[in-house]
Amino acid sequence: MIEGRVQRVGFRASCNRRALDLGISGWVRNLSDGRVEVQAEGPPLALSELRAWCEVGPPGARVVRVTPSQLPITGDDWFEVRY
């Protein structure tokens, strides 16, 4: 979960591009409470790089907190923006 000023700043689209560049699969979506949720799978180094990116976000974002969680692996081979 990503908290702060993370909606209406292009966070999902930017996260999608970054994840694809890193070869990560999963998804990103806005939540109704103003947070952004990301589920990502991939090599540990790529996941660390995506997390570091999420801690800053795109220009205009003001990330306050990134809270990771461990989820079951799905084996998907794409990354998408969910609505």
UniProtKB/Swiss-Prot annotation:
<dbReference type="GO" id="GO:0003998">
    <property type="term" value="F:acylphosphatase activity"/>
</dbReference>
<dbReference type="InterPro" id="IPR036046">
    <property type="entry name" value="Acylphosphatase-like_dom_sf"/>
</dbReference>
<dbReference type="Pfam" id="PF00708">
    <property type="entry name" value="Acylphosphatase"/>
</dbReference>
<keyword id="KW-0378">Hydrolase</keyword>
<dbReference type="InterPro" id="IPR020456">
    <property type="entry name" value="Acylphosphatase"/>
</dbReference>
<dbReference type="InterPro" id="IPR001792">
    <property type="entry name" value="Acylphosphatase-like_dom"/>
</dbReference>
<feature type="domain" description="Acylphosphatase-like">
    <location>
        <begin position="1"/>
        <end position="83"/>
    </location>
</feature>
<feature type="active site">
    <location>
        <position position="12"/>
    </location>
</feature>
<protein>
    <recommendedName>
        <fullName>Acylphosphatase</fullName>
        <ecNumber>3.6.1.7</ecNumber>
    </recommendedName>
</protein>
<feature type="active site">
    <location>
        <position position="30"/>
    </location>
</feature>
<dbReference type="InterPro" id="IPR017968">
    <property type="entry name" value="Acylphosphatase_CS"/>
</dbReference>
<comment type="similarity">
    <text>Belongs to the acylphosphatase family.</text>
</comment>
